């Protein structure tokens, strides 16, 4: 009985902080609280019986709850011959909160019917590939980043992905990013990622010669004064405080 009233609370709440608080309450009941598997099923039942407009409003909750049941609903929408339902399903999967849907996104990018679908799905992959996620270890996340890079066809897409790659704080990520310092079109995001990785002193100190060489390259390459300052400080073993 609790879930339908919580769902009604989400739909009644004005956009903004109140709506977000209502959404968090539903997600907590359906993912963490005692009896959450039954609550998640109750939410899916509420979602299925909701109007199209209400389903649209509940999309982010559906994605945040995730799981096989939610993905089944989304896959049914994507497979629908109704173009509006397919678009709705693609929007839902593109909002998924973690990388569990990555293989499905890769598959869907390959089957995209037009550029808009491809852009939506690839954008979702670029967003989730490096996300902190307890369902994928760092090596698998980096593999997903590499797989996503292979799907990118524009430097703007590659730039977004390279900038985000530094969220995977490993030496293997550093080794993946460094060669892009030599590519003029992608040197800027590579500089940013190298510096972000160098921010982590343990990682930097464990591979000092490699980081020193890469930071020298950043200083010689970037036109961003803040990156030059940071790279210089990290080379000297100093810290850097992010400006508030």
Which residues does each PLM region occupy?
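Beta-propeller blade termini and top-face loops
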Residues: 14-34, 38, 48-57, 64, ...
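Amphipathic alpha-helical scaffolding segments comprising HEAT/armadillo-like alpha-solenoid repeats
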Residues: 1-12, 33-48, 56, 67-79, ...
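Alpha-helical protein-protein interaction modules
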Residues: 124, 184, 190-194, 202-203
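Short inter-helical turns and helix N-cap capping residues of alpha-solenoid HEAT/ARM repeat scaffolds
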Residues: 14-15, 50-51, 81-82, 113-114, ...
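Core register positions within helices of long alpha-helical scaffolds
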Residues: 9, 25-32, 61-64, 68, ...
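Long beta-sheet-rich domains in secretory-pathway and surface-associated proteins
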Residues: 152-154, 168-171, 189, 201, ...
């Amino acid at each position: 009985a609790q879930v339908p009233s919580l769902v009604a609370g989400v739909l009644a709440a004005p956009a903004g902080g109140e709506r977000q608080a209502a959404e968090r309450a539903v997600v907590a009941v359906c993912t963490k609280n005692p009896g959450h598997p039954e609550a998640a099923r109750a939410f899916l039942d509420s979602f299925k019986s909701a109007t199209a407009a209400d389903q649209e409003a509940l999309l982010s909750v559906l994605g945040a709850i995730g799981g096989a049941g939610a993905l089944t609903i989304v896959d049914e929408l994507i497979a629908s011959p109704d173009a509006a339902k397919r678009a709705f399903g693609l929007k839902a999967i593109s909002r998924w909160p973690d990388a569990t849907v990555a293989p499905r996104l890769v598959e869907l990018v390959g089957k995209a019917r037009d550029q808009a679908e491809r852009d939506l799905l690839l954008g979702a992959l670029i967003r989730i590939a490096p996300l902190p996620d307890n369902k994928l270890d760092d090596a698998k996340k980096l593999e997903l980043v590499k797989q996503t890079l292979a799907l990118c066809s524009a430097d703007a897409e590659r730039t977004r992905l390279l900038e985000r790659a530094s969220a995977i704080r490993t030496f293997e990520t550093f080794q993946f990013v460094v060669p892009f310092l030599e590519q003029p079109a992608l040197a800027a995001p590579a500089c940013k990622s190298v510096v972000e990785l160098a921010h982590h002193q343990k990682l930097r100190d464990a591979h000092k010669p490699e980081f020193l060489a890469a930071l020298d390259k950043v200083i010689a390459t970037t036109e961003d004064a803040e990156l030059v300052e940071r790279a210089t400080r990290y080379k000297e073993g100093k810290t850097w405080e992010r400006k508030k």
